[in-house]
């Protein structure tokens, strides 16, 4: 955790340096010309994709909910929002919302709905390529028959594709694009090994494949489409988290 705090502090300092330019009446206030943020990933970048139904009700009662953060429930920000504030650029909204919980949970959900003009595509539980993310609604069907939250878990590949569709197939070059993904691939593979469904060696190979795929997607679907400022964040040290 100490290592993660140090990295975030360094990242914030770098953004502050980039944001030191004088503000003009006809453009961004930072020297690199960033005027928007686009985010892809999983729960660590999700700003409310699941803040619907019963989850939204909890939010009304507590001042928060639908966000994966240990920060204050009222006004607590995740890292993408802090970076947006430092640049400064507008904080965007979830590009898709929805939840399809199993009936046994007693929770109500909402249809999966795309949100026009919103460019945070990150969703809790999402993997790099596979749609079968952590707590995915797809696991509710046979042969899995899981009782779970029914998360959308749109994979990062599809998140990037959705943005290209929404933005006319390219980037302006003035966005800060953030990518943080891969942890859920590790978790799913770890669970598969624990269940005896595959060997540790196969799991390591699958995780390496996901990492290579992520790099390829960033090159072909982000950089090659005109993005100039791309921030790819390494996975946190999972062994130092409560899960690890």
Report residues per predicted region:
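Gram-negative bacterial Sec-dependent N-terminal signal peptides
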Residues: 2-27
């Amino acid at each position: 955790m100490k290592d993660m705090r140090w990295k975030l502090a360094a990242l914030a300092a770098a953004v502050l340096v980039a944001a030191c330019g004088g503000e003009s009446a006809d453009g961004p206030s930072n020297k690199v010309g960033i005027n928007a943020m686009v985010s892809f990933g999983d729960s660590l970048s999700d700003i409310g994709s699941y803040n619907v139904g019963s989850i939204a009700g909890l939010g009304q009662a507590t001042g928060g909910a639908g966000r994966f953060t240990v920060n204050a429930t009222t006004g607590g920000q995740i890292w993408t929002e802090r970076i947006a504030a430092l640049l400064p650029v507008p904080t965007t909204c979830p590009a898709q919302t929805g939840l399809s919980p199993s009936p046994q949970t007693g929770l109500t959900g909402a249809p999966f709905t795309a949100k026009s003009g919103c460019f945070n595509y990150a969703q809790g539980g999402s993997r790099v390529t596979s749609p079968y993310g952590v707590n995915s609604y797809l696991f509710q069907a046979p042969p899995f028959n899981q009782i779970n939250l029914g998360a959308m878990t749109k994979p990062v590949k599809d998140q990037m594709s959705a943005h290209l569709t929404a933005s006319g197939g390219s980037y302006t070059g003035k966005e800060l694009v953030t990518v943080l993904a891969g942890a859920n691939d590790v978790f799913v593979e770890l669970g598969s090994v624990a269940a005896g469904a595959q060997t540790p060696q196969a799991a390591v190979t699958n995780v390496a494949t996901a990492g290579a795929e992520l790099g390829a997607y960033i090159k072909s679907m982000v950089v090659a489409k005109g993005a100039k400022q791309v921030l790819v964040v390494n996975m946190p040290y999972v062994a130092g988290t409560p899960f690890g």
